[in-house]
Amino acid sequence: MQAWVIGNWKQNPATSHDVNALLDDLCAAISTTKQMSHDNSARCQIMVAPSFIHLAAVNGRLKDTSILCAAQDVSGHSASVGAYTGDCSAQQIVDAGATWTILGHSERRQYHQESNDTLLQKMIHALSQDLGVVFCIGESQAQYDTKQTLEVIDNQLAVIKEFITQQPELIKALPTRLIIAYEPVWAIGTGKVPTVAEVSATHKHIKQILAGFADSLSNMTVLYGGSVNADNANSFAADPMIDGALVGGASLKADSFLTIATAFSQASI
């Protein structure tokens, strides 16, 4: 299975100048990596998710590279146009050059009170426009401490089950247009990291739940996110249940981001 390493830039960098500087560093690092291994991009797909305001410019810079471009969210109100101040629709995001979007990140769930119903509408809008979905799930510190991780994940994955019920004509797109990112909320940006064994067991559970939804979902890509960095990437990449990483802070430094991508690329040999 091809690995995926996705950089979620969140509300960074601050200026267009800084965005271009990061892209310069990233493209230079990618070029060096390809010189070391021509098959690198085939083994590990790299993708970055900039802010909406930088989406078109980043896509323009990356269109002749193997790096894909994703949005960080889509409107839950309309897939195309409408009187929804501040929203960006899936159609607009595709027009800007993105081929994927992140949905359900814990920061969106926390700061914008995104519910399963909201995320279902966003998923429908995205996939109806052939915009792939990186669907984020994960438990809080309190839920982890009280051993509710699997219960929480099952509840969050219910969005996908309901999507299949409501949109049977789109089921065929899911194996190639849906990625799950398991991100324990307590590990995001904190430096706290679950053990590889814990992540592996959780990923196995996620894959089993998805396979139970539909036969076509028996081999889904599941990424890990939460304080992934250049120092621990090899450990996560070595586990066959972990198909890649959703990277936050480390994706804002080209060298560390490419070190993570190289770890998963080499593990896919």
Swiss-Prot record:
This protein's pathway: Carbohydrate biosynthesis; gluconeogenesis; Carbohydrate degradation; glycolysis; D-glyceraldehyde 3-phosphate from glycerone phosphate: step 1/1
GO cellular component: cytosol
E.C. numbers: 5.3.1.1
Annotated catalysed reactions: D-glyceraldehyde 3-phosphate = dihydroxyacetone phosphate
Source superkingdom: Bacteria
Broad enzyme group: isomerase
Cytoplasm as UniProt keyword: yes
Keywords of this entry: Cytoplasm, Gluconeogenesis, Glycolysis, Isomerase
Any one of the GO BP annotations: glycerol catabolic process
Gene3D superfamilies: Aldolase class I
Annotated binding of substrate, by residue: 8-10, 189, 227, 248-249
Name of one Pfam family that matches: TIM
Gene Ontology molecular function terms on file: triose-phosphate isomerase activity
Main location: cytoplasm
Active site (UniProt): 105, 183
Compartments in which it is found: Cytoplasm
Record family assignment: Belongs to the triosephosphate isomerase family.
Name of this protein: Triosephosphate isomerase
